[in-house]
Swiss-Prot record:
InterPro entries: Ribosomal_uL3 (IPR000597), Ribosomal_uL3_bac/org-type (IPR019927), Ribosomal_uL3_CS (IPR019926), Transl_B-barrel_sf (IPR009000). GO terms for biological process: translation. It comes from Lactobacillus helveticus (strain DPC 4571). Belongs to the universal ribosomal protein uL3 family. This is Large ribosomal subunit protein uL3. Residues 119-146 are annotated as: Disordered. One of its GO terms (cellular component) is cytosolic large ribosomal subunit. The gene is rplC. One of the primary rRNA binding proteins, it binds directly near the 3'-end of the 23S rRNA, where it nucleates assembly of the 50S subunit. Part of the 50S ribosomal subunit. Forms a cluster with proteins L14 and L19.
Length: 212
């Protein structure tokens, strides 16, 4: 069954394995999540557990948010997400989910929001090659031809625009270390997002054997 937790990306560091191998890891702080709601087929049409992470100031919360949090006997949360495919009997509204839900060697998927780069051109956004800089060329960093026949821009044409700030999931990452007393997960490799961005860590649905 699926397990999941919400957390915050702290940054990257390096640790040594038991075999003395230096491994780059991302440090994820996941203080205890509160189970805000348990959704069932009878009441909602599907099964899921709704988790809440990081307290939100009440002055910034509206009445529906406060009422929803009151049912779980907790304060309003800043980051709320659902985890599907879980064993519902293991969760109760108001209970907590901690990092020791996972163990070292677990394979997980991590979902976050990619870093924003603002408005960028084709070369940075799509990796397009530039044109010649000299010998009379007038094609340097522009997008290129839009087509010679149709009188419109084709759908999906790679053009300049806003880069980043999109939902990204990286699959089959390995948990190298669990530090339960500090509410920290150390995940091998990098995860989406900037420092202090909010992420979702859950069991990989297409897990492959961990490469140790």
């Amino acid at each position: 069954m699926t397990k999941g937790i919400l957390g915050r990306k702290v940054g990257m560091t390096q640790i040594f394995t038991k075999d003395g191998v230096l491994v780059p890891v991302t440090v994820v702080e996941a203080t205890p999540n509160v189970v805000m709601q348990v959704k069932t087929v009878e009441s909602d049409g599907y099964e899921a557990v709704q988790l809440g992470y990081q307290d939100k100031r009440e002055v910034l919360s509206n009445k529906p948010e406060k009422g929803h949090a009151d049912k779980a006997k907790t304060s309003p949360k800043r980051f709320i997400r659902e985890i599907r495919g879980v064993e519902l009997k293991d969760y109760e509204v108001g209970s907590e989910v901690t990092v020791d839900t996972f163990k070292e060697g677990d394979v997980v998927n991590v979902t976050g929001t990619s870093r924003g780069h603002g408005y960028q051109g084709n070369i940075k956004r799509w990796g397009q090659s530039r044109g010649p800089e000299t010998h009379g060329s007038r094609y340097h960093r522009i997008p290129g031809s839009m087509g010679s026949i149709i009188n419109r821009v084709p759908k999906g044409k790679r053009l300049p625009g806003h880069m980043g700030m999109k939902k990204v999931t990286i699959e089959n990452l390995v948990i190298e270390k669990v530090v339960a007393d500090k509410n920290v997960l150390m995940i091998k490799g990098n995860v989406p997002g900037a420092k202090n961005s909010l992420i979702v860590v859950k069991t990989a649905s297409k897990a492959v054997k961990a490469d140790k």
